[in-house]
């Protein structure tokens, strides 16, 4: 950081500089604005990480890569311009940028991995046709995310009902508070709705077979969930950290119900109601496991 002067929170990197070093401005709390010249071709890993006062940045077209943790936990960053010259955005590049309101992912970027985790002010995201890999937690804890769009010519992903799905529609990769899970989904991926705190209820359609690890974890306002007949497995902590009060199970035989201990790890099931089909009410109400719930409720109509 000693290479460059900061005046009233603003740093203008001189023309001719070609590189911003690894962690060069890391934890610089006086930095509010950075001006990067078009002679810079390389930004080092973690170059601006934890610059909590940094509010805006424009990346010049000379840059082709935003590296790992480049703007990690820049909690005041509201605006960032990423030019179409950028082809790589590294893991956790914008993680924790809680005030970042919008961002454009350039065509050419192929891989996203925890890139925008905990960007709590991000309202919509557009995924270009070039993106072929989206890692777990890439958009987790984006609590205000309401719209998900994927370019129609993307060969791997598509968007339906504000969900990001694989092209064949079988795997739900990630969703948001306004998601409607479409018919045809077989798998809800690990961390698909993780920390989606504005999600209050969700309908899992018939046909879903697998509900992944932490898929609805820490959705603290989620109050109800349904388990369709098709579900074969609900894995570790799938609904931990929620406010679920009611579970709707569409299975006639309680012994065929997927294990609910691990998915609800950390939650007290004796505070939850389980709603079951009318014809199976007796079996559930006398079943040793389901007796542990607050109440077994007879449903005369399908949830």
Name each model feature, range by range.
Residues 22-24, 45-49, 67-72, 90-95, ...:
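Consensus positions within tandem repeat domains that build extended binding/scaffold surfaces
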């Amino acid at each position: 950081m000693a290479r460059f002067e900061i005046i009233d929170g603003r740093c203008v990197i001189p023309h001719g500089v070609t590189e911003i070093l690894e962690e060069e401005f890391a934890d610089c709390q006086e930095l509010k604005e950075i001006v990067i010249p078009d002679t810079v071709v390389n930004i080092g890993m973690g170059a601006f990480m934890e610059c909590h006062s940094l509010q805006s940045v424009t990346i010049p077209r000379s840059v082709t890569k935003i590296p790992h943790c480049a703007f990690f936990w820049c909690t005041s960053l509201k605006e960032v311009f990423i030019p179409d010259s950028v082809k790589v955005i590294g893991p956790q590049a914008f993680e924790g940028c809680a005030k970042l309101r919008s961002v454009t992912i350039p065509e050419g970027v192929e891989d996203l991995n925890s890139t925008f985790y905990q960007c709590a002010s991000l309202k919509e995201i557009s995924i270009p046709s070039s993106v072929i890999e989206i890692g777990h937690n890439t958009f987790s804890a984006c609590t205000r995310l309401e719209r998900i769009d994927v370019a129609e010519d993307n060969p791997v992903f598509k968007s339906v009902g504000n969900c990001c799905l694989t092209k064949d529609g079988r795997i739900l990769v990630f969703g948001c508070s306004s998601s409607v899970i479409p018919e045809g989904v077989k798998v809800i991926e690990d961390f698909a709705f993780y920390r989606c705190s504005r999600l209050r209820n969700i309908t899992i359609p018939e046909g879903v077979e697998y509900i992944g690890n932490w898929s609805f974890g820490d959705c603290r306002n989620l109050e109800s969930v349904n388990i369709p007949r098709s579900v074969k497995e609900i894995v570790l902590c799938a609904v931990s950290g929620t406010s679920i009060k009611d579970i709707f199970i569409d299975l006639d035989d309680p012994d065929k119900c997927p294990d609910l201990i691990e998915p609800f790890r950390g939650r007290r099931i004796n505070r939850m109601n389980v709603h079951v089909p009318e014809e199976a009410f007796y079996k559930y109400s006398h079943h040793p496991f389901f007796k542990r719930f607050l109440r077994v409720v007879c449903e005369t109509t399908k949830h």
